[in-house]
Every structure is written in structure tokens, then in C-alpha cells.
């Protein structure tokens, strides 16, 4: 059967919160089958566990934020994206602040952490959410949509009207049957505009943001000396975010995702819309890995790029 996965050993790192600017310690621990991805605020007098769930996402203005009983874990999308890309089903994520550290602004550090911990299969069938009917959410000209598809395919279009972004391509389509997440998506960094960063700092946000963890643009160009990691890094980062946003549903999706100018809020609304229509999806497993969609096998997802 196609099996669930966790990590083999505990791994730790330290980074800063992009909004708080404070030091955050992050520990990843193995978890038993059917645990899911569980975030734990270990800095509180009594630690609070918040399982990743589409219905636990609260604030989505600047990041995807998990909330439970007034306790928050913010900016979970890059770590969730790495878990999705490597096929990690079960994991404990201990964090000493209300923000997952931003690291380099991509998912690459989290991929490295998980790979260095080692990935192991567990004696339980991997569960997928198979979309059986189209589901769509619109907000003005923005939209996000899921269609039935035997695999996981994404098509994302951005529209930033900026000279540097225009040159790099605003549309990307990826099918993970023939694309390596680690090689093609994981290293794409978040990006922001210098004038927005200044405004956010005045509001007490983005205190940890810098060119070490983001692509920063002025009105005309990219300010980072080292340029871009991918020719189309902007749209690739939006896809990286979407993969993480969608993975909070708790299982990998078998679906085709199409989006235009979507963000954390619209992605979460799409998951809620799917879950509200029980006839639009089913939970499936694969007793024979050969019958599963290409790209979800252990070697396909966990090979070092």
C-alpha cells in the first residue's frame, strides 16, 4: 500500500519571526500514524496543541494563521508547503512564539530540515482527498478553483503590473507527476515592495523582514544583489504558498487547482467550500502503490534534489 510518512528523528532550528522580529526556536518531532501535522506552542505555561485544519485558519491577511482558544501560530504556509512537497503526513511542530520563523523566505530550509531528520514510511495507508466535483470561490476578479484530476496539478496566474515581475512570467502550470517540488518550487522566496515594508513597520509588522528572507522591489527593479533564484520566482512563490495553504486540509489533494490572483484567504475559503459539500470529495487510499497517481511515491517525493 501507499504508506503514511513521518520523520525519523527530532530536528531543531532557530530563526526570526518575519513580523515580530523576535527569535523563534522550532523543533520537528516524529508523530504516530493518523496524527496529522500538529503545531504546539511550547512557550506557554501549559503548551497548546493546534492541529493543522482548514477550519482552524483564522487570520489570512498577511499569512495563514492557525488559531485555537485565542492561541495563534502564524505563517505556517511555507512549512506546510515543505511537508506537502515531501509527502509528510504526521509531524509535531514545537514553536516558542506565535510565528513560524521565516528562515530564507522560501520552503528550502524546512525541506533541508525534514530531509536531514530522515523520512520513514509508517504502517498505515496514506489518505488522500479526491475531489469529485468542481468547487470554485470568487472575490471580484480573483478566483480559486478545484476540479477532479487523478494527481495534483496547479495553474497559477499573478498580475502585479511591475516591470521586474512582468519580465519573469506571471503564469505557471505544474503537474507533480513530472515535476520535482524540491528542485522546482521549494527555493522560491516571498517578495514585497519597499514602500509596503515601510508602511508595515509603522504598523508594528515586518520587523524581521529583510533582503535575507525576501525579494524586495522598488518601483522599477529588484533590490537584492543576488537577483532571482528562478526566472519565474514570483509566481513560483505564490504556488509554493498555495501548496501550503491547501495542505492544511489534512491530506494531499487529488485535484487540479486553478487560481488567478489568489492568496491565503481565498485558498482557505476554497477548502471550506469543498468541505461544506460532502458530495464534492471522498477520502481514498491505495492498497497497491502502482495504482496511485504518479508523483506520490516515496522515491519520487523524498529523493534529494
UniProtKB/Swiss-Prot annotation:
Keyword Lipid metabolism: yes
Enzyme class per UniProt: hydrolase
Keywords annotated in UniProt: Hydrolase, Lipid A biosynthesis, Lipid biosynthesis, Lipid metabolism, Metal-binding, Zinc
Gene: lpxC
Co-factor requirement: Zn(2+)
Lineage top rank: taxon: Bacteria
Known catalytic reactions: a UDP-3-O-[(3R)-3-hydroxyacyl]-N-acetyl-alpha-D-glucosamine + H2O = a UDP-3-O-[(3R)-3-hydroxyacyl]-alpha-D-glucosamine + acetate
Family: Belongs to the LpxC family.
GO cellular component, one term: membrane
Protein name according to UniProt: UDP-3-O-acyl-N-acetylglucosamine deacetylase
Role: Catalyzes the hydrolysis of UDP-3-O-myristoyl-N-acetylglucosamine to form UDP-3-O-myristoylglucosamine and acetate, the committed step in lipid A biosynthesis.
Record-listed Zn(2+) binding positions: 78, 237, 241
PANTHER family (UniProt xref): UDP-3-O-ACYL-N-ACETYLGLUCOSAMINE DEACETYLASE 1, MITOCHONDRIAL-RELATED
Pathway(s) annotated for this protein in UniProt: Glycolipid biosynthesis; lipid IV(A) biosynthesis; lipid IV(A) from (3R)-3-hydroxytetradecanoyl-[acyl-carrier-protein] and UDP-N-acetyl-alpha-D-glucosamine: step 2/6
Organism field: Burkholderia pseudomallei (strain K96243)
InterPro entries on file: Ribosomal_Su5_D2-typ_SF (IPR020568), UDP-acyl_GlcNac_deAcase (IPR004463), UDP-acyl_GlcNac_deAcase_C (IPR011334), UDP-acyl_N-AcGlcN_deAcase_N (IPR015870)
BP GO terms, sorted: lipid A biosynthetic process
Cross-referenced Gene3D superfamilies: lpxc deacetylase, domain 1 (3.30.230.20), lpxc deacetylase, domain 2 (3.30.1700.10)
Keyword Transferase: no
EC number: 3.5.1.108
GO MF annotation terms: metal ion binding; UDP-3-O-acyl-N-acetylglucosamine deacetylase activity
Amino acid at each position: 500500500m501507499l504508506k503514511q510518512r513521518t520523520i525519523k528523528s527530532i530536528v531543531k532550528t532557530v530563526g526570526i519571526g518575519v513580523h515580530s522580529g523576535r527569535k523563534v526556536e522550532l523543533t520537528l518531532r516524529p508523530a504516530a500514524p493518523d496524527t496529522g501535522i500538529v503545531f504546539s506552542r511550547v512557550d506557554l505555561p501549559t503548551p497548546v496543541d493546534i492541529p493543522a485544519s482548514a477550519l482552524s485558519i483564522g487570520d489570512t491577511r498577511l499569512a495563514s494563521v492557525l488559531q485555537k482558544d485565542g492561541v495563534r501560530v502564524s505563517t505556517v504556509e511555507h512549512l506546510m508547503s515543505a511537508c506537502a512537497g515531501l509527502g509528510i503526513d504526521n509531524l509535531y511542530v514545537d514553536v516558542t512564539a506565535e510565528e513560524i520563523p521565516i528562515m530564507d523566505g522560501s520552503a528550502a530550509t524546512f525541506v533541508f530540515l525534514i530531509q536531514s531528520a530522515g523520512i520513514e514510511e509508517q504502517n498505515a495507508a496514506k489518505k488522500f482527498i479526491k475531489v469529485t466535483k468542481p468547487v470554485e470561490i470568487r472575490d471580484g476578479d480573483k478566483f480559486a478553483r478545484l476540479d477532479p484530476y487523478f494527481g495534483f496539478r496547479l495553474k497559477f496566474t499573478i498580475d502585479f503590473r511591475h516591470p521586474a515581475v512582468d519580465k519573469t512570467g506571471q503564469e505557471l502550470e505544474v503537474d507533480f507527476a513530472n515535476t520535482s517540488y524540491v528542485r522546482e518550487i521549494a527555493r522560491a522566496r516571498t517578495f514585497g515592495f519597499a514602500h509596503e515594508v515601510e508602511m508595515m513597520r509603522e504598523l508594528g509588522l515586518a520587523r524581521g523582514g529583510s533582503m535575507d528572507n525576501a525579494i524586495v522591489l522598488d518601483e522599477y527593479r529588484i533590490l537584492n544583489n543576488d537577483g532571482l533564484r528562478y526566472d519565474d520566482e514570483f509566481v513560483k512563490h505564490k504556488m509554493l504558498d498555495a501548496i501550503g495553504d491547501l495542505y492544511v486540509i489534512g491530506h494531499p489533494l487529488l485535484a487540479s487547482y486553478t487560481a488567478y490572483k489568489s492568496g491565503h484567504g481565498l485558498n482557505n475559503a476554497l477548502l471550506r467550500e469543498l468541505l461544506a459539500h460532502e458530495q464534492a470529495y471522498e477520502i481514498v487510499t491505495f492498497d497497491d502503490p502502482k495504482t496511485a497517481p504518479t508523483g506520490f511515491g516515496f522515491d519520487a517525493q523524498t529523493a534529494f534534489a
